[in-house]
Amino acid sequence: MKLLKPSWVSHNGKPIFSVDIHPDGTKFATGGQGEDSGKVMIWNMAPVLKEEDEKNENVPKMLCQMDNHLACVNCVRWSNNGLYLASGGDDKLVMVWKRAALIGPSTVFGSSNKLANVEQWRCVTILRNHTGDVMDVSWSPHDVWLASCSVDNTIVIWNARKFPEMVTCLRGHTGLVKGLTWDPVGKYIASQADDHSLRVWRTVDWQMEANITKPFSECGGTTHVLRLSWSPDGQYLVSAHAMNNSGPTAQIVERDGWRTNMDFVGHRKAVTVVKFNPKIFKKKQKNGGSPKPSCPYCCCAVGSKDRSLSVWLTSLKRPLVVIHDLFDKSIMDISWTLTGLGMLVCSMDGTVAYLDFSLDELGDPLSEEEKNSIHQNIYGKSLAITNTEPQLSTTIIENPEMLKYQQERRNSTQANSGPGATGSESATPKLNSVMNGESLEDIRKNLLKKQVETRTPDGRRRITPLCIAQLDTGDFSPALFNSAPILPSGSSMSNQLTSQLSSDSSPGQAPPLGLRPSQDPMLISPPPSSAAKVLEDNKDGVKSCLLLTSASKIEPMKALDSRFTERSKATPGATAAIASSTGLTPSERPKESTPMQKDVKSKEDTSSDSEDKMATINKNLAFNKRKPELLMDGAEVVEKRKKGRPRKDKMAASIAQPLTQTTSPAEREPSRAAAAGAGAAAPTAAAALKLPTPSIKKAFTLQVSMDPSVVLEVENEVSVVAGSRLSQLRCSRDGRDWNTLLPSSVLTAAGSSDVVAVASQDRMLSVFSSCGRRLLPAIQLATPASALHCSAHFVMVLTSGATLSVWDVHKQKALVKNESLLTILSGAAVTVSQSMLTQQGVPVVGLSNGKSYCFSLSLETWTLIADTADSLVQCADFRNCLPNQDAPMSSGPLAAMQGRNFNAGRLASRLSSTPHHLQQSMTLAFLENQLASALTLQSAQEYRYWLLIYARFLVNEGSEYRLRELCKELLGPVHKSATTSWEPTTLGLRKRDLLREVLPVVGENLRFQRLFTEYQDQLELLRNK
């Protein structure tokens, strides 16, 4: 054995916490503390291996130095193929580095040109999720996953094929997690923490396999790291700091039953790091000796806080070698060469040591074929994971139905990969022509546009030179992990992912605008009254977008990235249904809003004839959007109009929301006499809310149904009989007309295919059938009607006294009786912006603060169904759970009230750094809220839609408990019982039919095949019965 301590490997006296040798053995990386930041350094291995190379000045020793980490680097690890280097530090970040192929040497910043970076390594992605220092990182055997652990007590598994996607977050440790290691066959990952436990996790479902605590019960959190290691044959897991009879040991955990009967003993202080040699050895045959069968064995190195290093062979009871006082401080990390004969050790004293062994000392290493043969004999076929998804290829599919769903999913994945991607050339972009969605020629042109040109007094041009470095396209190679380069700003978004979501934009829409990677899109949310605008600035030759968004106009958000475009397309029938239930007040729009209306309408989609018709109808309809007035005793309520033209943002707001129709302030202005008549008493606590009432028009026309076509015509004061002024209501239904007379002027009217209702100035409500027959006697309202809606055979009235009532005309029964809106109208600044009545008779009210409520008939209370400012909406992300064949829902009341708000929220969350685990939990809560809201609204179509998305989300996230509970509820009792209260249907949908739709979704994930088989068999049993 040879021992060398290269003095030139140093972090300027600062501690070195990690070391790792490149798989090809030509270089090694160190990580530790820098001057004022974390430091990652890559060194040449040749001067370590050969003395002549160390003395040769032409052979560089340091290859690269990276100071991107803001705090100390605790771990560096090369990927198994050697293309990537991962580093984790106290700045809570995991950085993945790749060599820049086409950039030449450069000097290290701040080194006075003494240190030169021979190789250029740049950070290709930053993984953000941990909330504490990252202590260890580790690549899985086939580079499918990258694991990181932290002092936040969690282990995060990253999808190394799709950085920065997170696969899962393993929770269970109650102390700082300080070490990770992968099972060499990819079935388990083990972690060790300060909570006196070593935990083993399964990779098939990311659940805990074993929790080993006994050997660690006496341990204290005295070590900086706990780097455990798995033997190359997979049979043994050796922990770091353990105790046996109050003495420090390295505990040996057997894979079979996770028994802890053996340990490595001898170190005087706590063991900090254990590292197995990657090779499996057999005894070396002497010259001329006949080969004798011998059991393969492994080699393990153990480092401790006592500054000593021991090397063990599993075929010997005592260590092969022990080196005392190798360093001045604790040993922090160990790394073996891939040949198995060299080892690097680093210490907190800032130095490293290299140990070179011979074959006589360790034995003959087995070839890779022999090593794989051992794995196959013990575990079956080795895990050759080639699928992009974290599914193990060795998992046996036990159910033929499951096999069918797996094949269908594979076929759909191939079909979605693109019709033109038939060959390798079409599937992979050319590296020398495209980078991050822009051609290199475009990038050069954009850079040239940044040149500053001035002219001297004599007229000569002076151009300031602009350095254009050679563009490095090697960084953007999609060969490994299919990973896209990150934005220079640190954001993990990439334009390369743009094509992954199918675009459903109509021909009339503008294509998405391209954003350069160096520019961060800004999302600025002004008050809701402002209209949506897109300001384009062509400075620097690039279109930069400034988004001013309102609650309902989110179209320009496509300009950021087509990944975030999930537009809701209203069907013609849905548009008609919504229009028929809006209860609009007859009035004409103010003249000043007409130009703006035309401008906006030219930008919107008018793809169907019915939508054009509805736009024409809504042109003559209006609904008040003024804030509710607080009528107090003696308080004068006078609204002064400002001189001049109204503000543009207020005009745009009058047409921005599709379900809100506005009128001019003059039409809704209360009379000054009425306001002055209130007196001048001091305001009291018993302030009454008052909603505005429609103004009386001489005549108006209202189309309330498209199929069949129902048109209402109202003409006030058509004649005077015996001093009474009569008004006429005429209804045209499929060419058949009927009319009736009313003793008072009509304020508003509404109708459906079943009933017609009118509210009069004398606070009377009249209800007629579709043929003109009066169905109910005139209903006396407490206050004048503010809004009126009809849907099917239900009638809803919202009065100016802020009360709401709903009647079932067929049953002649009140479903909601004078329910006050006081509980939801909190504050004088909140007003009713829209209202509607569903086909099932459920009233819905939308407020100006972005919240929407419906009155639950069963709970008899107001329930919140939408909130534009809800943080759950801001972070919900279920794009991966949307079925490919379904368009975004647009026909239900829930979608009508929410609009595109949650699309905007998810876009905003992309521009911020929301932790993935938090986004995961909030998405789950959001989907459950959607299910509950659809159930309250009695919207069967939307309930089924969100149920399938919810089930797919649970399957993708591996939430077995919730998924099992959902399936159990849908299945119901298998055997009949007198005590069961299970309802076989919900909203008219058979629950077991819904379960049959959910099961194929469950069948897409192999980890749930037992759950799939269990409920599939029970459904078949019930069907046979």
Curated annotation (Swiss-Prot):
Entry annotated with the keyword Nucleus: yes
Bias-annotated ranges (Polar residues): 412-433, 490-508
Highest taxon, organism lineage: Eukaryota
Residue numbers spanned by region Disordered: 408-433, 490-534, 563-614, 634-678
One Pfam family recorded for the sequence: Beta-prop_CAF1B_HIR1
Recorded GO MF terms: nucleosome binding
Compositional bias of kind Basic and acidic residues: 588-614
Subcellular localization(s) per the UniProt record: Nucleus
Family per record: Belongs to the WD repeat HIR1 family.
Protein name as annotated: Protein HIRA
Organism: Takifugu rubripes (Japanese pufferfish)
